[in-house]
């Protein structure tokens, strides 16, 4: 419902009753009126028969169909989105479809049969076979399919007419809306990228226009004020000029009237009455002249003022037009200059701000870099201090371990020499009980003392070898500790907690390593002492047995042992001491050869004596060979 100017405010249709009970209640309300009771109506509804309920159901269905048609008509004619918010939109039903042709009917009926016959073939080949069979069918069978098609087609036409009458226009509108929406979406997608770039330029241009409009408004207001002031001045000037012109003309007219009056008075007056006539004429002429001049001056001044005002108005209008045009041009020039100045000033401000921001960013970045360098330097100096402290600690620990190893080696050598002397005294005391073997062993006794002296020299050499081996193990331990330190530094960068744990672990590792090294060195020194004691005993026995057979074998065996290379002065001292010890041992052996005899002892006793000697060496008893070994190390 549309008019020339406005649309009618059509209200949406109301929903009808949706149940049979509601339809029954409406009928009773219309019939009973004021005497309506809910309880009685409910009882009557429960007593209704099936036929009456079917009648009410038909009423409900018809009411729903009418409501849908009215609502659809309302939605097609209404305008404005605000009203469509509370109105539910009715969906347009689909078009009625055309029926299937005769060939497709034949396919629907016989497709399964052909598929069961030809299982190995594809669908395309099966369709070819069916089309050939359909073309070969007789006309009677083909007419059956065509008649069914024509009946359904007649029904289709009737349904399509009904649908087109109700929903044809709405369906066309929806199709056009969909097409427009798709085209708009494509255009928006294509222009989306350009709109982003144009939006920025539009925003800047709109700002410039606003600035120019503000400046133009100010200039127009100032020009209008100037025009008002100039018009008021022109009006005042015209009034003052008209007054001046009237005054000057009045004076001229008065002078001419005086002359005329004087000449006329001379002609008319006689000689007798010259004085009286002249005085009277003067007074009358002056009064008349004044009156006539004032009246004439006023008329002339009014007419002239009108003409002058018109001419001045024309001139002023033309001058105003010229001024307005010039002022408009000047305003435009001023606006353009103000725009240029503003744009240049805004650009300069923006550029200055951007430069200030860049400078501030550069300053902050420099400050951050300086702080980072300071932190790095402080961290590197701290790491260097820590590494120097650790190296000092490790050197102190190594010196302590060296001292402990030297002490343990010296004690072991001294305990070995004393244990040998005690074992020899015990063996001599037992030699008196044994008879036959004493003579043979007494003969080999002086050489056993020499062998002991030679073994003592070998002990010193072995102790020096142990010292060299300990130095090698220490260097390896240092290398391992350095590797551990490097690994700890790399791990310390990962986390502060890892640093603390790594430091504690390195300290515990260094302590455990130093303790384990000291233990190993002590155990090595103990083993060396026991091995030397066993070797001396075995060598003394072998010498006593092989004295008669090969006296030079022992000397060859002794020469096989490699001694460490030392200085010539140390060698001479050792040789002199060994020779003096041999001489003393030979003298003692000659004096005691008859009384003292060596006896064979079990290995278990020897081991027990060795253990006693080790204990005494730990207690701190030192000998000559032990002091010498410590000096060399």
Curated annotation (Swiss-Prot):
The record's listing under PROSITE patterns reads: HMG_BOX_2
The UniProt entry, under SMART domains, shows:
HMG
Modification after translation is described as: All four histones are processed from the precursor molecule.
Q: Any idea which UniProt keywords this protein has?
A: Chromosome, DNA-binding, Nucleus, Phosphoprotein, Repeat
Which compartments is it annotated to reside in? Nucleus; Chromosome
**Sequence ranges of Polar residues compositional bias:** 446-469
Annotated Basic and acidic residues bias: 353-374, 382-401, 478-491, 540-550, 559-612
Q: Where is the composition biased (Low complexity)?
A: 212-224, 253-271, 406-416
Question: Mind telling me which GO cellular component terms the entry cites?
Answer: chromosome; nucleus
Q: Which InterPro entries match?
A: HMG_box_dom, HMG_box_dom_sf, UBF1
Asked whether the keyword DNA-binding is assigned, the reply is yes
In this chain, composition skew of type Basic residues spans 174-190, 272-309, 330-352, 417-444, 496-524
GO MF term set: DNA binding
Return the Pfam families for the record: HMG_box
Which residues does the annotated region (Disordered) include? 170-633
Q: Which residues bind DNA?
A: 12-74, 96-164
Query: Which superkingdom is the protein from?
Result: Eukaryota
Question: By what name is this protein known?
Answer: Micronuclear linker histone polyprotein
The opening ranks of the lineage are: Eukaryota, Sar, Alveolata, Ciliophora, Intramacronucleata
């Amino acid at each position: 419902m549309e008019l020339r100017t406005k649309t009618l405010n059509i209200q949406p249709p109301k929903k009808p009753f949706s149940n049979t009970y509601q339809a029954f209640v409406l009928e009773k309300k219309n019939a009973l009126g004021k005497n309506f009771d809910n309880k009685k109506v409910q009882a009557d509804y429960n007593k209704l028969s099936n036929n009456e309920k079917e009648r009410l159901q038909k009423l409900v269905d018809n009411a729903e169909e009418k409501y849908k048609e009215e609502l659809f008509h309302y939605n097609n004619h209404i305008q404005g989105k605000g009203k469509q918010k509370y109105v539910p939109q009715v969906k347009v039903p689909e078009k009625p479809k055309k029926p299937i042709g005769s060939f497709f009917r034949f396919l629907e009926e016989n497709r399964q049969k052909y598929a069961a016959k030809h299982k190995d073939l594809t669908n395309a080949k099966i369709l070819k076979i069916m089309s050939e069979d359909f073309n070969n069918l007789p006309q009677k069978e083909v007419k059956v399919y065509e008649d069914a098609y024509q009946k359904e087609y007649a029904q289709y036409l009737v349904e399509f007419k009904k649908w087109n009458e109700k929903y044809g226009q709405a369906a066309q509108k929806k199709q056009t809306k969909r097409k427009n929406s798709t085209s708009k979406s494509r255009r928006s997608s294509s222009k989306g990228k350009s709109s982003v770039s144009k939006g920025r330029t539009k925003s800047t241009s709109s700002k410039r226009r606003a600035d120019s409009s503000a400046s133009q408004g100010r200039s127009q207001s100032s020009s209008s004020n100037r025009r008002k002031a100039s018009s008021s001045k022109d009006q005042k000037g015209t009034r003052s000029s008209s007054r001046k012109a009237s005054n000057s003309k009045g004076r001229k007219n008065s002078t001419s009237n005086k002359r005329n009056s004087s000449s006329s008075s001379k002609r008319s007056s006689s000689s007798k009455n010259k004085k009286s006539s002249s005085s009277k004429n003067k007074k009358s002429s002056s009064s008349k002249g004044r009156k006539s001049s004032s009246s004439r001056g006023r008329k002339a001044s009014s007419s002239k003022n009108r003409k002058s005002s018109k001419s001045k108005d024309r001139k002023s209008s033309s001058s105003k037009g010229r001024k307005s045009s010039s002022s408009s041009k000047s305003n435009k020039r001023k606006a353009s200059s103000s725009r240029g100045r503003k744009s240049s000033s805004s650009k300069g401000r923006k550029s200055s701000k951007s430069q200030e921001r860049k400078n501030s960013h550069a300053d902050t970045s420099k400050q951050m870099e300086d702080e980072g360098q300071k932190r790095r330097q402080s961290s590197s100096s701290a790491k260097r201090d820590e590494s120097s402290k650790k190296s000092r600690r490790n050197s102190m620990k190594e010196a302590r371990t060296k001292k402990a190893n030297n002490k343990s080696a010296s004690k072991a050598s001294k305990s070995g020499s004393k244990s040998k002397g005690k074992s020899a005294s015990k063996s001599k005391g037992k030699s008196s009980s044994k008879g036959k073997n004493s003579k043979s062993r007494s003969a080999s006794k002086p050489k056993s003392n020499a062998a002991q002296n030679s073994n003592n020299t070998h002990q010193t050499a072995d102790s020096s070898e142990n010292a060299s081996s300990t130095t090698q193990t220490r260097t390896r331990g240092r290398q391992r500790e350095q590797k551990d330190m490097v690994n700890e530094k790399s791990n310390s960068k990962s986390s502060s907690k890892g640093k603390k744990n790594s430091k504690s672990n390195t300290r515990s590792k260094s302590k455990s390593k130093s303790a384990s090294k000291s233990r190993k060195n002590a155990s090595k020194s103990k083993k060396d002492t026991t091995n030397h004691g066993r070797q001396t005993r075995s060598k003394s026995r072998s010498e006593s047995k092989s004295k008669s057979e090969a006296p030079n074998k022992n000397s060859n065996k002794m020469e096989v042992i490699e001694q460490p290379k030392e200085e010539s002065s140390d060698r001479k001292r050792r040789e002199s001491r060994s020779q003096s010890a041999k001489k003393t041992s030979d003298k003692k052996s000659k004096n005691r050869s008859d009384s003292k005899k060596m006896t064979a002892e079990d290995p278990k006793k020897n081991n027990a004596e060795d253990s006693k000697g080790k204990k005494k060496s730990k207690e701190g008893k030192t000998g000559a060979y032990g002091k010498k070994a410590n000096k060399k190390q």
